Structures are given as C-alpha cells and as structure tokens.
Curated annotation (Swiss-Prot):
GO terms, biological process: glutaminyl-tRNAGln biosynthesis via transamidation; translation
Matches recorded under SUPFAM superfamilies: GatB/YqeY motif, Glutamine synthetase/guanido kinase
One GO molecular-function entry: asparaginyl-tRNA synthase (glutamine-hydrolyzing) activity
Record keywords, A-Z: ATP-binding, Ligase, Nucleotide-binding, Protein biosynthesis
Protein's gene: gatB
Protein name, entry field: Aspartyl/glutamyl-tRNA(Asn/Gln) amidotransferase subunit B
Organism: Rhodococcus jostii (strain RHA1)
InterPro entries the UniProt entry points to: Asn/Gln-tRNA_amidoTrfase_suB/E, Asn/Gln-tRNA_Trfase_suB/E_cat, Asn/Gln_amidotransferase, Asn/Gln_tRNA_amidoTrase-B-like, GatB, GatB_Yqey_C_2, Gln_synth/guanido_kin_cat_dom
Length: 503
C-alpha cells in the first residue's frame, strides 16, 4: 500500500498515541523591491502577462545577471531580525531542473553558502506559552514564472487541455526561510506551525520587506510533515505540502497529513516522499510529484555572479535600521493600555491588533477600538467570509464612528447602521450621517419627554414601581422610547427623563 492508497483517516488521538509528529517549515517571501533580483524589470503585481520580462529573466543567450542590492539588504535585515548569523561570504548557486515556468532550466538560488544561518523565532501559542522555533537558514533566490492550466476541473495540469505561461514573476527576488526540525510539540504541532507562520508574517510586515499577502502568493508556505513512532530515534518519511495560502490552512494541512500518514502506516503501507497539494475546499491534500533530493538538482556555483560579501560595518548599519519588533511593540502597547495577557492574545489571534492600534492612533480610545474590531466588525467579517483586515472599512473610519458616539450624534445601536452603510461603500461615517439625518440621535428633550410620558401612560404599573424607588424597572420604559424613536435617542438621557418624570 502506498500513500495514495490511504484508507480512512486515523482519529487524531489515535495518531498521538502511537506517533510523534515532526515538522519542518519552508516559507518563501517575495521581497517588495521595485525591480527583479538580477535584472531591471519591474515587479508590479497584476500586470498583463509577459509584459515585465527581458532577456535576463527569460534566460536568453548572452544575457548576464546583476545582483539587486536592495534585495540583499532586505535579506540581511530578515536574517538579523530572526537572530541569525550573517555570512561574510555568501555564494549564489544554480539549481538545475526542467519545468516550463523556469525559462533558464535552472534557478539562481543559494545552496551551501546562504546569506543567513542559525537563528530562532519565539512564537506565542494560543494559551500564552512560548515555543522557540529554530531557524536553519534564510537564503536568496529568484522566483519562477507562473503556469495557468486551462480546461481541467482542478486548475492543475492533470486533465487540462492546454497550459499558458506568464513570466512576469520569473526573477522576482525571494528569501526562503527554512526551519530546523520541529519536534516535541505532540498534539500542538499543527498549532505551532500556524503560530510560527503567523509570527513570521508579522515580523516581515514590521520590517517592510514584503506585503506578505498569502492570497497573492507573496508569502508561500510549504509544510514538511513526518511521523516517528513513539520511542523511535529514526525520523519517518516526510511529505511536503506546497503553497498553503492562509494561516488557518497551515494548521489544517498539518493536522490532515498527520492523520493521513498514520492511516497509511497503520494499514501496513509506506509513506512516499513526495510533494502534495493542499485542497482549500475540503481541507485535504492530494499527491503531486515524487520529492527530489539535493543531489537531483546538481547544484554548482553560479559562474556569472560574484559572491555576496557584506562587510561587518554594513551589517551593523542595517541592524540599526530594524524597527521595533512585533513582540517588543506588543509588550509596550499592553503596558500603555493596561490590558491583560488574555486580552492581547485574543487581539492577536483575531488578527485585530494592528487594526486596533491604528484606530487608537486615529483618535479612538483603546477600549472602544477593541470593542468594535473584536465584536461587530468581526461578525461582519465572518458573515462575508473574509479576513478582518479585508473589510471595506479603515481604522480611521472606525475612529470617526467612535468620535460620533462620543459627541452624542450617534448611539451604539445606530452606529452599527452607520458602519453598515460604510461597508456598503457609501463613504466615510460623517458623510453617511449627512446623507441619512434620520440616523442622528434625537437631542430635542421636548420630543423625548413626550415619548417618555406616552410610554409611562401605557405602563402604569411600571411607572408606579419607578415612583416607589425601583429604578431598574425604568429599563422597560427606556426600551419602549428607543423603539418609538427608531433607536435615535440616547438611552442614558432617556433614563434620566424617565426618573425625572416619576420623581
């Protein structure tokens, strides 16, 4: 039996009873440089196919590469932020393989002399514990082109009638970050994988070296998974699940592979060393191709490029450009806001921290900003099936809503209607309020007093309770007035008027 012939998945608890999961993460990051790694072609995302190419990135005879200094700077800054040692002598190498999206039939990468080695990244798990992920290396390379397979049901080459090639991406600068073996996590292995990619994304975003858009492929994660029988010392055969394109999918893919491989082993089969593709629709993986070894790529030094030899002075200069790193920033903000570890974890896990920070910077209080992003806006994101940051509302607009509430123009209920209008593309909150005056809180006490008197007259028993000192009974009257005013009144002011009327 092979990996392809796997029976039903093994229960997760049964997997953990017999096997120790072993992971290795490889993350490719497209650098946000204006030009490609070895030529002056632009790197703009979404351009018309094959409009950002030249003889160098197409591998035409006689063309020679030139190293992009900005890409080297970004690679060194990434290595420093990951606590790596920066090599004083890094060499490019040719990685030889044939594939249609590789126009030269080799990729310029780094092999045994990468730009950065031996680092670590401490990641915070859901319960607040810290897990150290050791970094093996970070190396520079160029991206491949992009294949579009037409006519098949899956978008892959199998079953396609023909394929199209876009070489705009060929030669875009990449840094590949490779971890050392991640073991000992047990049941939390999928969580550790997701937490690592999350922390790495946040770090890279803070360095401003990439937009780290997993949905657009500027950050691509490959998850290597193997199982080792409990008590064994020899690692199992690994599979590599390619291009997992969301944080949630990282966790799902690792968990699925653990269960699938265990099912193969328990049925007497052997896990095949292969690449696999994650299926977003159902959370499964499907077989790709047999996984090559380093020897298969026949690496040798790139003869057209000199080694990269950053001086100690340049490295220290770049170290001085590192921003406040995410974990330092979070600790400072937590102290400034006076919130608990649990609150900060919830903000991070919800993907809301940067949004809340930006909303506070735009003028809202931390409590109000946090409330909007983790409650109503989180609900809207869930309903729309998008990430919180993808909602069509900005932190500045949320801060405007908070300001309108603080000024008394809106109450919390009506403010949600204003946010709905903003989400529908009707402009900033102030513009929405100007276009919908019926949403503004009623401030005319004469009208409110009339509504209060009407509600009290309709509920004489409750009015009597209030007169008898049972102030809590006023809630029913306040609710009736809010209903009568279609939510446009200030509940606090209505309650004051109710108590005055019964005094």
């Amino acid at each position: 039996m092979t990996a392809v012939d796997a029976p039903d998945l093994l229960d997760y608890d049964d997997v953990l009873a017999k096997y120790e999961p072993v992971l290795g993460m490889e993350v490719h990051v497209e650098l946000g440089t204006e030009t490609k790694m070895f030529c002056p072609c632009p790197t703009e995302f979404g351009a018309e196919p094959n409009t950002q190419v030249c003889p160098v990135c197409l591998g035409l005879p006689g063309s020679l590469p030139v190293v992009n200094e900005a890409a080297v700077e970004s690679a060194i800054r990434i290595g420093l932020a990951l606590n790596c040692s920066i090599t004083p002598w890094g060499r490019f190498a040719r990685k030889n393989y044939f594939y249609p999206d590789q126009p030269k039939n080799y990729q310029i990468s780094q092999y045994d002399e990468p730009i950065a080695t031996d680092g670590h990244l401490d990641v915070v798990l859901d319960d607040g514990t810290t897990w150290r992920v050791e970094i093996e290396r970070a190396h520079m390379e160029e991206d491949t082109g992009k294949s579009l397979h037409v006519g098949g049901a899956t978008g892959r080459i199998h079953g396609a009638s023909h394929s199209l090639l876009d070489y705009n991406r060929a030669g875009v600068p990449l840094v590949e970050i490779v971890t050392k073996t991640i073991s000992g996590a047990g049941a939390r292995a999928p969580e550790v994988a997701r937490a690592y990619v999350t922390a790495l994304r946040d770090l890279l975003k803070s360095l401003n070296v990439s937009d780290v858009r997993m949905d657009q492929g500027s950050m691509r994660c490959d998850a290597n998974v193997s199982l080792m029988p409990i008590g064994a010392t020899e690692l199992g055969t690994r599979t590599e699940t390619k291009n997992v394109n969301s944080l949630k999918s990282v966790e799902v893919a690792v968990r699925y592979e653990m269960r699938r491989q265990a099912a193969v082993l328990e049925a007497g089969g052997e896990v095949i060393q292969e690449t696999r593709h994650f299926q977003e629709a159902d959370g499964t993986t499907s077989p790709g191709r047999r996984k090559e070894t380093a020897e298969d790529y026949r690496y040798f030094p790139e003869p057209d490029l000199e080694p990269v030899a950053p001086s100690a002075e340049w490295i220290e200069e770049l170290r001085g450009t590192l921003p406040e790193l995410p974990w330092v920033r979070r600790a400072r903000i937590q102290a400034d806001w006076g919130v608990s570890d649990e609150v900060m974890r919830d903000l991070v896990n919800a993907g809301a921290l940067d949004l809340v920070i930006a909303t506070v910077e735009a003028g809202a209080s931390p409590e109000a900003a946090r409330s909007w992003w983790v409650s109503y806006l989180a609900q809207q994101a869930n309903t729309r099936g998008v990430e919180l940051a993808e909602l069509p509302i900005t932190p500045a607009q949320v801060a405007q809503v908070v300001a309108l509430i603080d000024s008394g123009k809106l109450n919390n209920k009506v403010a949600r209607q204003v946010v709905d209008h903003v989400l529908e593309g009707e402009g900033d909150p102030e513009q929405v309020v100007a276009n919908h005056p019926e949403l503004v809180v009623e401030r005319d006490d004469t009208k409110l007093k009339a509504a209060v008197e009407e509600a009290l007259a309709a509920n004489p028993d409750i009015a009597e309770k209030i007169r008898g000192g049972k102030v809590a009974a006023a809630g029913k009257i306040v609710g009736d007035v809010m209903k009568a005013t279609r939510g446009q009144a200030d509940p606090a002011r209505v309650k004051e008027l109710v108590i005055e009327a019964c005094g």
